[in-house]
Regions:
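N-terminal, positively charged/glycine-rich alpha-helical extensions of SAM-dependent methyltransferases
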Residues: 1-31
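Conserved alpha-helix/loop element of class I SAM-dependent methyltransferases that forms part
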Residues: 42-61
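Class I SAM-dependent methyltransferase SAM/SAH-binding core
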Residues: 66, 74-116
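Conserved glycine-rich SAM-binding loop
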Residues: 71
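A conserved beta-strand element that flanks and buttresses the S-adenosyl-L-methionine
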Residues: 131
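A short, conserved alpha-helix within the catalytic core of class I
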Residues: 139-150
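Conserved beta-strand signature within the Rossmann-like core of class I S-adenosyl-L-methionine
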Residues: 156-165
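Short alpha-helix
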Residues: 188-206
Length: 233
């Protein structure tokens, strides 16, 4: 069962990405001109997406994949172009609709289903692979690990995901963000060190069935995120 904290943060994220930041997110994930700061975020996200996809087989034909927190669908579409049958889920109806439009505009025959919903939803089905790029970073470490636990029950081979690394800059941004009125601020990120995350994964029992694999940090301007790989033993 989702905690009260998880549900409250989920609602906050949905409101922010579906209303407050939908236009900005649409621009960020396109080729549209953006500010210098957002250009660094775009480059960082591109590098992270490449990292996560490179941790999966180059040929995904015959494989199933869930993109948990798909946003505007860039990663889901790239996975489908490599042959995967993809289910992509996001809390924001606005971003999901944009993802569907971008898929149609490609005019390619790709097996992607975009769904509005919660990545913890057990009714989404079972998959060979799960990708959660920057979709856990707004939850505290306990809720993030519980989300991985829920997803793990449905995943046969591998999960790749990101978390916000605990750095002095991110800690300062996290503290400063809380000074703004709630209506004016984005959902805060929840930085965590790799060591603390590893302890939580072990305490949750995930490491009994899953092997902690590769780990890689992307640090480009204002984009800072850390990728981790879990492979079923």
């Amino acid at each position: 069962m989702a905690s009260v904290g998880y549900q409250a943060r989920r609602d906050e994220i949905e409101t922010y990405f579906d209303r407050t930041a939908a236009d900005a997110w649409a621009a960020l994930t396109s080729d549209a001109p953006v500010s210098r700061i957002r250009r660094t975020v775009r480059r960082g996200r591109d590098a992270m997406r490449d990292t996560l996809l490179n941790w999966l087989p180059a040929d995904l034909t015959g494989s199933t994949l869930i993109d948990a927190g798909c946003g505007t669908g860039t990663l889901a579409i790239e996975a489908a172009q490599r042959g995967a049958e993809v289910v992509a889920v996001d809390l924001s109806p606005t971003l999901v609709n944009l993802a569907r439009e971008r898929l149609r505009d490609l005019n390619q025959t790709l097996d992607v289903t975009f769904i509005v919903g919660d990545m913890r939803d057990m009714d989404l089905g079972s998959f060979d692979y799960a990708v959660a790029m920057d979709s856990l970073i707004h939850y505290d470490v306990a809720d993030g690990v519980q989300t991985l636990e829920a997803m793990a029950q449905q995943i046969h081979r591998k999960m790749v995901f990101t978390f916000a690394p605990k750095t002095p800059l991110l800690a300062l941004m996290h503290a400063t963000g809380r000074l703004f009125p709630r209506a004016d601020r984005a959902p805060s990120i929840e930085p965590v060190s790799p060591e603390r995350l590893a302890r939580h994964l072990k305490e949750a029992g995930l490491t009994q069935e899953w092997l902690v694999g590769r780990s890689h940090r992307i640090d480009v301007g204002f984009y800072k995120s850390h990728a981790m790989e879990l492979t079923r033993k």
